[in-house]
Design a protein with these regions (language model features):
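ABC family nucleotide-binding domain
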Residues: 1-140
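C-terminal boundary and immediately downstream tail of ABC-type ATPase nucleotide-binding domains
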Residues: 130-131, 135, 141-160
């Protein structure tokens, strides 16, 4: 699960942040975990940042370290909760590219977002909620192309 706040340990490097849970929680061998952590940093386009501390990284880079950290646990599902909310447009794009790559590789994902254009592109199914209540759901083409509910239409007119 990833949130808008990165929740990285500030006193640990990017590599150490990624390695911690597989070693401490899963009991995996350090050498194996370290090799995987290096691979994951390359996967999220942060190769060469292994020794960087969170405070030395941009918001988008920190979010991608958080994604790599989650992937280190080999999840079958990723939950992204407003992961681009606090990011500027350039770093937002970096994170969205990473999420798109994971989806294209077959990672099952649940994405809570206000990035409607992105959701329309990558989602198999979209749920539109208002104050925690599902207002409407369906395939992206139907929901974005011909929303049935007035609340959905009004929102989409404002953001698209």
């Amino acid at each position: 699960m990833l949130f808008r706040s990165y929740n990285l340990f500030p006193h640990k490097t990017a590599l150490e942040n990624i390695m911690m849970a597989p070693i401490d929680v899963l009991g995996q061998p350090r050498a194996e975990v370290e090799a995987r952590a290096h691979e994951l940093l390359k996967k999220v386009r942060l190769g060469g940042k292994e020794s960087s501390y969170p405070g030395e990284l941009s918001g988008g880079q920190q979010q991608r370290v958080a994604i790599a950290r989650a992937l280190a646990m080999r999840p079958s599902l990723m939950l992204f909760d407003e992961v681009t909310a606090a990011l500027d447009p350039e770093t937002r794009k970096e994170v969205l590219v990473t999420i798109r790559q994971l989806v294209e590789e077959g990672m099952t994902s649940i994405l809570v977002t206000h990035e409607m254009a992105f959701a329309r592109e990558i989602a198999d199914h979209v749920y539109f909620t208002d104050h925690g209540v599902i207002v409407e759901d369906g395939p992206p083409a139907a929901l974005f192309g011909a929303p049935q509910k007035e609340r959905t239409r009004a929102f989409l007119e404002q953001v698209l």
